[in-house]
């Protein structure tokens, strides 16, 4: 089944480093690629590189612009890789292993646990800040949303600063201007 899926999606078994590495060339979300293939539509592959010096990628842009697809592509391919599956990337790509993959995607509000969207995100960020380290991959969609924009942006920047200090790796999507400026003015 693994070999069939690899053939179907163009997956390869790249050389894997024991250290965290994300230097992917022409990476494709395999499920999206299969769906588009059935519709005879092309997929836009992505090149993504995270390094020791630039280990967190902030993605911003308009709604329906591909931010979440990029984030989910990174998450799915990294998880597939760590499960021993072939992944659809170029043979020139470099891949590595993370000890933890932490995700905050979607709306996790809970009536049973009395959690709003924002408090759910805050709880996730608290857990991520506590557990993240230099071998952690963080995947966060719409960072800091669910509250008034100035407060959400300030909270997201404070949390991002902690992730940078802990040398965690990550892909984070946002609409907040302050996080875009943070990315331009800070290392990491």
Predicted regions and their residues:
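Extended, charged alpha-helical coiled-coil/arm scaffolds that mediate oligomerization and mechanical coupling
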Residues: 1-4
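ATPase nucleotide-binding head domains, primarily ABC-like/P-loop NTPase cores
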Residues: 9-11, 17-188
């Amino acid at each position: 089944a693994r070999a069939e899926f690899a053939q179907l999606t163009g997956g390869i078994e790249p050389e894997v480093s024991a250290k965290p590495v994300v230097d992917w060339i022409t990476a494709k979300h395999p499920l999206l690629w299969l769906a588009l293939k059935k519709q005879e539509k092309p997929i836009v592959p992505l090149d993504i590189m995270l390094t020791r010096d630039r280990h967190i990628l902030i993605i911003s842009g308009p709604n329906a612009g591909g931010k979440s697809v990029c984030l989910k592509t990174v998450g799915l391919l990294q998880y597939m890789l760590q499960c021993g599956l072939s992944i659809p990337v170029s043979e020139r790509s470099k891949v590595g292993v993370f000890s933890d993959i932490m995700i905050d995607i979607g709306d996790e509000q809970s009536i049973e646990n009395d959690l709003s969207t924002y408090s759910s995100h805050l709880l996730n960020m608290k857990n991520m800040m506590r557990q993240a380290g230099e071998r952690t991959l963080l995947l966060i969609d719409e960072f800091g949303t669910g509250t008034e924009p100035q407060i959400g942006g300030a909270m997201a920047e404070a949390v991002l600063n902690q992730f940078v200090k802990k040398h965690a790796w990550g892909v984070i999507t946002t609409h907040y201007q302050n996080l875009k400026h943070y990315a331009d003015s800070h290392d990491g």
